[in-house]
Amino acid sequence: MASKNSASLALFFALNILFFTLTAGTNCRCNPSPKPRPLPNPKVPSPKVPTPSVPSPYVPTPSVPSPSVPTPSVPSPSVPSPNPTPVIPPRTPGSSGNCPIDALRLGVCANVLSGLLNVQLGQPSPQPCCSLIQGLVDLDAAVCLCTALRANVLGINLNVPISLSVLLNVCNRRLPSNFQCA
């Protein structure tokens, strides 16, 4: 027991010496002297000195009538613009492979997919899911459903290519050839 007390006492003195050594080594004054307050300087307005105004002398200009000469009208030549605007062909809607639908709205397709895989009792209606992708080209519909499946918006971890083709078949859509849901 005496060894524990002596070890605790030795640790106390070691920390005490370390503390006072570090505080003394910082060369910090304990009582900083207060800063003297500056005396307020009253603002004295500067006197306004009027600027002398000197009138400019009047110089009369002789009035000479100008001869009346008709000016011929010359048509200005049309200059072609240096940078012609390129003609951009009109974009066909749906051929871009972009999804114009918010992927979170495709969560209604989860009921269709889970009902087809016998995860849910009863037959869910594919109408809400199919109505979302109804106006899209097959490529855009595939891109939208692929995005929803990859982001796991549907909440089901499945084989993405099989799930994609199942959802498209339910809505009477075709998976475009050479389309890969990457």
Curated annotation (Swiss-Prot):
Family, per entry: Belongs to the plant LTP family. PEARLI1 subfamily.
Entry protein name: pEARLI1-like lipid transfer protein 2
Any one of the GO BP annotations: defense response to fungus
UniProt Sequence repeat ranges: 42-46, 47-51, 52-56, 62-66, 67-71, 72-76, 77-81
Localisation per UniProt entry: Secreted, Cell wall
Signal peptide: 1-25
Phenotype upon gene inactivation: Reduced cutin accumulation due to lower cutin biosynthesis. Early flowering in long-day conditions.
A Pfam family per the record: Hydrophob_seed
Function: Probable lipid transfer protein (LTP). May improve freezing survival. Seems to control the flowering process and lignin synthesis. Confers resistance to Botrytis cinerea.
Species whose genome carries this gene: Arabidopsis thaliana (Mouse-ear cress)
Positions of region (Disordered): 33-94
